[in-house]
UniProtKB/Swiss-Prot annotation:
InterPro entries assigned to the protein according to its UniProt record, in alphabetical order: ASFV_MGF360 (IPR002595)
Name the UniProt record assigns to this protein: Protein MGF 360-21R
Protein role: Plays a role in virus cell tropism, and may be required for efficient virus replication in macrophages.
Species name: African swine fever virus (isolate Tick/Malawi/Lil 20-1/1983)
Family per similarity comment: Belongs to the asfivirus MGF 360 family.
Length: 307
């Protein structure tokens, strides 16, 4: 295991211990404990009485409570690599300890992550095991771990459009690859609405715009979500649904948005964005880096006497 490509690519030490316990590898269990792994993590995957006895000898508890299980989840997912995400899925997504309905907080975390992404299925109608699988798949796309993406893509083709949906939310590069690879039942405007439900998601908003999505619908979604920076980006791209957006802002008593939208006569499209006309994700991400990109119309608004 230590000499394997997966270990060299990077595994969280406690996750490696869990794998060694699953494989009943006494030598590796003792080695990983010597290196500093927590023997209690082994209780997640122990499957023989001999290894359970070894875990006890090494100081393990009899069982983990729901908060300790939550700590296991947070600890092993913190390490970012393709193989770490794949192994997290393989060890946890069908693990009875993690599927227990007593793990209320874990279920809330997973449901929160998947809530915006569940645009072509009903979240409450799928099993928690599937939710966990979709969660790890989404992380692979979010961090652009190509090996993990291919692993999930090949193994879970029945998750209709899931890779595309995650790309819209997190990853312009993978969105571009999968959107041009296969047909989708998801309308480009639906993709744009999803993109606008994530703050500072400029590259994916721009990509959907270049693919023909309605920028006014994007502007409306940004107002509904109260995402001011996305709103200004939509205005930069030529959105002009000010009356409808102003009505929404007034109905929700969002006075900050009312003030922004009231300056509609000051705003105009940003020609530098509109002239690029590309779907090349590298060019888009270079242009719209969230640390360097500044909205032309946001700067105009900040320059008014009423800001």
């Amino acid at each position: 295991m230590i000499k394997s490509a997966s270990f060299k690519d990077g595994l969280e030490l406690n996750l490696a211990l869990m794998k060694a316990v699953q494989e009943n590898n006494r030598g590796l269990i003792e080695l990983f404990i010597e290196w500093g792994a927590d023997i209690n993590f082994g209780l997640i995957t122990v499957n023989t009485e001999n290894i359970r006895s070894l875990c006890r000898e090494l100081g393990a508890k009899e069982a983990l409570n729901k908060w300790e299980l939550l700590n296991v989840f947070y600890t092993v997912k913190r390490f970012k690599s393709s193989n770490n995400i794949i192994l997290c899925h393989e060890l946890l997504s069908n693990n009875p300890l993690f599927l227990s309905e007593n793990n209320v907080q874990l279920r809330r975390i997973i449901n929160y992550k998947l809530k915006n992404l569940s645009i072509n299925f009903i979240l409450d109608e799928i099993s928690f095991s599937e939710k966990l699988t979709r969660f790890w798949y989404a992380l692979a796309v979010e961090y652009n771990f190509t090996e993990a993406i291919q692993y999930f893509y090949q193994k879970y083709k029945h998750f209709k459009d899931w890779r595309l949906i995650c790309g819209v939310a997190y990853n312009t590069f993978d969105l571009h690859e999968i959107y041009n690879k296969e047909k989708t039942d998801i309308d480009i405007n639906q993709m744009m609405e999803l993109a606008c439900t994530y703050r500072y998601n400029y590259p994916n908003i721009y990509y959907c715009f270049m693919m023909g999505a309605d920028i006014n619908r994007a502007m409306i979604t940004s107002v509904i979500k109260s995402y001011i920076y996305n709103l200004f980006f939509c205005i930069d791209l030529g959105a002009d649904a000010f009356e409808e957006c102003l009505e929404i802002a007034e109905q929700t008593n969002n006075f900050a948005l009312v003030k922004i939208l009231s300056f509609k006569n000051y705003y105009s499209p940003d020609s530098s964005l509109l002239s690029l006309k590309t779907t090349d994700p590298e060019k888009i991400n270079d242009l719209l880096d969230d640390e360097t990109y500044e909205s032309k119309n946001l700067l105009i608004y900040e320059g008014t006497d009423y800001y």
